[in-house]
Swiss-Prot record:
This is Early 3 14.7 kDa protein. GO terms for biological process: symbiont-mediated perturbation of host defense response; symbiont-mediated suppression of host apoptosis; symbiont-mediated suppression of host NF-kappaB cascade. InterPro entries: Adeno_E3-15 (IPR004985). May bind to host IKBKG, OPTN and RRAGA. Its main location: host cell. May prevent Nf-kappaB activation by immune signals like Tumor necrosis factor, presumably by inhibiting NFKB1 dimer DNA-binding. May act directly at the TNF receptor to inhibit signaling. It comes from the Viruses. Keywords: Early protein, Host cytoplasm, Host nucleus, Host-virus interaction, Inhibition of host caspases by virus, Inhibition of host NF-kappa-B by virus, Modulation of host cell apoptosis by virus. It is found in: Host cytoplasm; Host nucleus. It comes from Human adenovirus C serotype 2. The keyword Mitochondrion does not apply. GO terms for cellular component: host cell cytoplasm; host cell nucleus. The lineage of its organism: Viruses, Varidnaviria, Bamfordvirae, Preplasmiviricota, Tectiliviricetes.
Amino acid sequence: MTESLDLELDGINTEQRLLERRKAASERERLKQEVEDMVNLHQCKRGIFCVVKQAKLTYEKTTTGNRLSYKLPTQRQKLVLMVGEKPITVTQHSAETEGCLHFPYQGPEDLCTLIKTMCGIRDLIPFN
């Protein structure tokens, strides 16, 4: 018997595990699509500079609530200021930022609430 397949003689337990894995994978895919749809529908005054649009988001439903995890990529900004006739170049780097929002309740609008919170998070928590 191969260890990677976890096959059993009767096959019933193996079949049950495979069905559970398929169901879990299907649910993860559905949640991933739901997040993509919410991100595409999200509109605010920040436009493409909104954290919701810039971050890589993953959404999980658990027995203790819902979690929206985010990962913001490294960013580099460059600004040239003129002082008299001499240019001053300012370069700023921000490190990769990751975190998550945990919503301990279950409801039909949980993802929407988490997306709105994520949108306003830049005002609450300073990102570089």
